[in-house]
Amino acid sequence: MRYFIVLLALLLVSCAIPAEEQDSAIYHPRTDTLSIIKTGMLLRAQLPSTYISNRPLDIWLPSSYHEGKRHNVLYMYDGQMLFDSKSTWNGQEWRVDEIVDSLIDQQQMMPTIVVGLHNGGNRRSFEYFPQRPAANLTALFADSLFTNIANAHELDSTFAVNSDNYLKYLVEEVKPYIDRSFRVNNSRVHTAIMGSSMGGLMSMYAIGEYPEIFGTALCLSTHWPGGFSQNEQIPQVFATYLKEHITPDRVGKIYFDYGTKTLDSMYGPIQKSMDEVLTDNLFTFNENWITLEFEGAAHDEQSWANRLHLPLIYAFGRNSD
């Protein structure tokens, strides 16, 4: 039975490519089927990039995918951490496959595929630090910040912040591949971006830079301090970015949350100041913006998995439109 399901999934993927696009000018990456998940189907593509270092791309198809419907698309940062606790650095995972499939089956969430965007390992912070805000840091502060980040990851030197190229990889390479290769709705209202910690910053940045692409940004445990300690300069440049780019006339919906334990204990006061910016920008709470606090929640995948259903329903719930 499992071999039949694998064959069926691969057939559906291949049939989703429009005939007019099946020519030698379009690169179709090698795709493997992984057996590490509990529900649905997980594919791993080797998609080369001109913007960032080459890495795997994970595409999870829910059990509903075989039913012939077009699906929404959720892009998620830190793809290494989403599906398999046996392969993660801390033995935890988001349990994305179990949670999304359950919500779809219970009619709480519209049919959705999940695209796992892998990070660059010890260069993750340089890929996931929003570039426009970073450019507004003073040179002395930025040098100290990124030197400390490089030292923490045992890098011999710092690297240029590369988040703009990471977003180009997502928007110009990954999304076109997903749109032409899978049965998806490709409009912005059917497209969301999600991440935690630095991935939360990048989700905010993605919708700010590409509001025509992403209709919803889901930002969990957003790492507003940017580095390893409290400071005023980094939250200030992020607040300025929100003021100028995260406005109701530009973006669809945006979700923030935070816990109160471990690293998340730093976030509450900063998030409240960001909420004031959103209020000043005329966002309407519980409509096009929401911020939630989770008492006792820590900065880890188990905590994010425990509340994952809430941002998913906010983005793609049956009554979310």
Task: Locate the predicted segments by residue.
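Positively charged n-region of N-terminal signal peptides that target proteins for export
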Residues: M1-F4
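Residue-level signal for mature regions of secreted extracellular proteins and peptides
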Residues: L8-A9
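Non-catalytic cap/lid and distal C-terminal segments of serine-dependent acyl enzymes
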Residues: E20-D321
